[in-house]
Structure formats: structure tokens, C-alpha cells
Amino acid sequence: MMDNMQTEAQPTRTRILNAAREIFSENGFHSASMKAICKSCAISPGTLYHHFISKEALIQAIILQDQERALARFREPIEGIHFVDYMVESIVSLTHEAFGQRALVVEIMAEGMRNPQVAAMLKNKHMTITEFVAQRMRDAQQKGEISPDINTAMTSRLLLDLTYGVLADIEAEDLAREASFAQGLRAMIGGILTAS
């Protein structure tokens, strides 16, 4: 019986999260209502609150989904490609994400500036991601791809900040079509990571 309940609950939870993503990215966090989310995914308020007790709980789930997507890039050692090239490709790939998804990331970051609860969620997300990026940087140091003198913890955070800057740039997708975009990223990231 429990397996059947979990199977039924997952699609509802996913529908709620998808609706929340869309509504938050279109209307902003404060203008979005739980009622609009219910209407968008055709569920009752009771069903919504069964899965998520507040907007902050929805944001937490979205943050964790986004964190998992980021970790998928850095969880395993990077093989067959230089670390700098991997970072450039990863950042360029973000410019192809749906504009609504990119807007949602910026909206959540802005909410983190106002709301200490969301700020704590983002801090945890950033710490988790940068720990994995720092590990991949240490791997690259061992291979001699980047300078052994780099502070991997701080540099991984700066690379994350660069990534968020690209996500927030409304022209990033158009700019990324130009070869000079990847070339500039490669020069910037390579300069930081290979400087002695």
C-alpha cells in the first residue's frame, strides 16, 4: 500500500513544483499566491498544503532540485576534458536554459536578500555546490591542469558567482552564440585557475 501511495504522491508533488516554478518566475515570489498554484495544477489547497506547508517550503524544494542539477555536473571526477574547458562548457550550457528558469533563479536570489529563511537555504545550496566544484578543482590540480596554489574553496565560490552572473544576464543566450563569448570565458577562467 505504501509504494502505491508514494507513486501517486510523486506526480502530484512534481505538478505542484512545476506550477510553482512557472508562477514564481512569471509573477515573482510575493505576487504569486498559493491559490494560483492550486488552480494551475488543478488541486485543492488541502492537497497543496499536504505537500508544502508554505511558499518557503516550495522554494526549498525548488532550490534542492536546482542544487541536484548542478551537482550532477560535478559529483563524479571529470574525465576526457580539461577542467577549464569543462567549466566553460558548463557555463555556456546554462545560457540555453529556458528564460523562465533563469528568471526564477534570479527571483529566488533576490528573495534571499530579503528573507533570512531563504538566505539560509541558498547559503546551504551554495556551500554544497562549491564543495563539489572545489573537489573537482583539487582533481585538476593533481593532474597539473590548474595552479596548485589556488584556494579551491574561494575560487569555486567565485566561479559560482560568475555562473549566476551569466544566468542573470538577459542577453546571455544571444551573446553565447558568438565565439568570443566562450573565448572570453576561457581566457577569464583559465587566467584565474592557471595563474601562479
Swiss-Prot record:
> What keywords are annotated for this sequence in UniProt?
DNA-binding, Repressor, Transcription, Transcription regulation
Identify one Pfam family in the record.
TetR_N
Q: Which residues cross the membrane?
A: none
Q: GO terms for biological process?
A: DNA-templated transcription; negative regulation of DNA-templated transcription; regulation of DNA-templated transcription
Q: Where is the HTH tetR-type domain?
A: 10-70
* InterPro entries linked to this entry: DNA-bd_HTH_TetR-type_CS (IPR023772), Homeodomain-like_sf (IPR009057), HTH-type_TetR-like_transc_reg (IPR050109), HTH_TetR (IPR001647), Tet_transcr_reg_TetR-rel_C_sf (IPR036271)
Q: Name one GO molecular function term.
A: transcription cis-regulatory region binding
- Keyword Lipoprotein part of the UniProt annotation: no
| Keyword Transcription regulation (UniProt) | yes
| Residue ranges: DNA binding | 33-52
Role: Repressor for the uidRABC (gusRABC) operon.
Protein name, please?
HTH-type transcriptional regulator UidR
Q: Which organism is it from?
A: Escherichia coli (strain K12)
Q: Name the encoding gene, please.
A: uidR
